[in-house]
């Protein structure tokens, strides 16, 4: 029987191990036993906490999205202007917890697996909608709503594209360059627009 009070710790260890295992293999073709071994626990304990691989994978993805949402809420609360809000959204998407080699590989694997999994597809759609709405909220204070939607769509595509590009590269992810590229894109798109920020 698992020790009382150990469940949250063990669940987190298994989720972290799932990110590492999926990231290392670049595939969801992993077993609960492999993830449990990476976490240093028994496969039986992993099954006890999650009930199987699919539930563990979904819990891992939800964990990454919760982390992203929590960090974003903190960053946005510190933003005082639309430009600061946009910068905060971009920076959080390329934070050290999200834009790490194994996490990037895990995200890419989730995108591929979404073609076969309605649950993963739904979670990715929630993520995309939240990113889009957060960007639009700030952008429409600087330009028209139609243009804000178009810029947000482009910025979201750039963020996803940069994750894919870094997943394919051998070098360590360069968050500063990624942030600069997305910020430059938004600045260029906004250039020549009358600013509503005063």
From Swiss-Prot:
Residues 8-68 form the HTH tetR-type domain. Pathway: Amine and polyamine biosynthesis; betaine biosynthesis via choline pathway [regulation]. InterPro entries: BetI_C, DNA-bd_HTH_TetR-type_CS, Homeodomain-like_sf, HTH-type_TetR-like_transc_reg, HTH_TetR, Tet_transcr_reg_TetR-rel_C_sf, Tscrpt_rep_BetI. This is HTH-type transcriptional regulator BetI. GO terms for molecular function: DNA-binding transcription factor activity; transcription cis-regulatory region binding. Keywords: DNA-binding, Repressor, Transcription, Transcription regulation. One of its GO terms (biological process) is negative regulation of DNA-templated transcription.
